[in-house]
A protein has these predicted regions:
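Residue-identity detector for glycine
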Residues: 98, 111-112
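Conserved G/P- and acidic residue-centered "switch" motifs that form tight phosphate/ATP-binding loops
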Residues: 349
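Catalytic nucleophile loop
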Residues: 352
């Protein structure tokens, strides 16, 4: 609640990780915030309980959670203390089967005798309609931008990405084209390369943007070390990557319209709200948010020759691949019709030169005399 209040003037969709008690269970959740509003809580689905991970000791999987959390901001305002660790507020749990439970918290000791909430809250600045909120808690939530209808965002948490069937797969089938991952992935020798390839591959499989933010070096403990390895990927390409073991910010320009076009072009898997992977009859909640649609300086660089690699070794490998693909096709055709020679009309241009090179390679593959 406090973070939402502090960021209500920030024009951004912000995700914050936190533990949340719901119906007597503790969940590891990502909260989506926008202009002072808490849009929804997304609980973690897959809980690691191997090697250095012990999440199942404390948390419950949120795979089947689908309900609302009622937050009374007026109660929070009255009980607010300058020490954030002591902040508590009334939470009413409501699920769709009609279960309701209201937990009353004794606030006798909140604030102390010198506590003055007027110094901390301004009634004129705090919207009356936000005093009480019913907020979704469900892994099946898509955050939709009212100002950019094609931008649809979903969240998953750390281990959710590392399993064979990540929640982001269903998110993508229901329209999400940008996935955010709030992670606490510790550092082990070689793990950064695997992590990077995982993020890149997932963005390619789902034809989406993928933002991966992990715990920083200041959160390391005696048991694990965190390197703050943050990544931004789009359709298989890593657009930004942070330096490990250093705090900082990364950013990148994502081409949402390009992703949308790629999804229309790839008809094998239809990305639409009414479709999902086989056996996944899932209903999704929409959490609308707003962003000011303004022009900014483009930081992303686009190559004027996108099909010609700038690195010499990669360029030579690409040219050799082109020759092999064409020569293999010609080889198959020559063998099929039992042809022992070829006639090429040479104009001296690039096309006829390429035709000659392809023919020579095809003859070599067949073991035929070039002459």
């Amino acid at each position: 609640v406090r973070i939402a209040e502090e960021t209500k003037e920030v024009d951004a969709l912000i995700f914050v990780g936190l533990p949340l008690e719901y119906n007597g269970k503790l969940y590891n959740v990502a909260a989506g915030l926008n202009h002072g509003e808490i849009l929804g809580f997304v609980p973690k689905t897959w809980l690691p309980n191997y090697n250095e991970f012990y999440e199942a000791r404390y948390f419950t999987s949120g795979e089947h959670v689908d309900g609302t959390v009622h937050i009374d901001r007026e109660a929070y305002k009255e009980r607010y203390d300058s020490d954030f660790d002591d902040v508590e507020f009334d939470i009413e749990m409501t699920s769709f089967d009609g279960f309701e439970e209201l937990e009353e918290i004794d606030d006798e000791d909140f604030g102390g005798e010198n506590f003055d909430d007027e110094d901390l809250f301004d009634d004129d600045e705090m919207d009356d309609e936000l005093y009480e909120e019913d907020i979704w808690i469900s892994p099946n939530t898509i955050f939709t931008c009212e100002d950019m209808p094609k931008l649809q965002i979903a969240a998953e948490i750390c281990e959710d990405l590392w399993v064979p069937n990540p929640p982001s797969v269903a998110h993508a089938f229901h329209g999400a084209n940008l996935i955010v991952n709030l992670s606490a992935s510790d550092e082990v020798v070689g793990k950064d390369s695997y992590r990077k390839s995982l993020v890149s591959a997932q963005s390619a499989r789902l034809l989406c943007g993928y933002i991966y933010a992990t715990a920083g070096e200041g959160e390391s403990t005696q048991d694990v070390v965190y390197g703050g390895h943050n990544l931004i990927a789009e359709n298989g390409s890593v657009l930004a990557e942070s330096k490990r073991f250093a705090n900082g910010v990364i950013y990148a320009d994502l081409d949402i319209h390009r992703l949308d076009n790629e999804r229309r072009r790839m008809t094998t898997c239809q990305f639409a709200p009414d479709l999902a992977p086989e056996g996944k009859d899932i209903s999704y909640n929409e959490a609308p948010f707003t962003l000011e649609n303004t022009e900014t300086v483009l930081t992303r660089k686009f190559d004027s020759r996108p099909f010609v690699p700038g690195i010499k070794e990669e360029r030579e490998r690409r040219c050799d691949e082109i020759l092999n693909i064409q020569a293999m096709g010609l080889k198959k055709r020559l063998a099929h019709i039992h042809c022992q020679n070829a006639v090429i009309g040479l104009s001296g241009g690039l096309d006829s030169t390429l035709a000659l090179l392809v023919t020579v390679r095809a003859f070599d593959m067949l073991g035929m005399d070039r002459s």
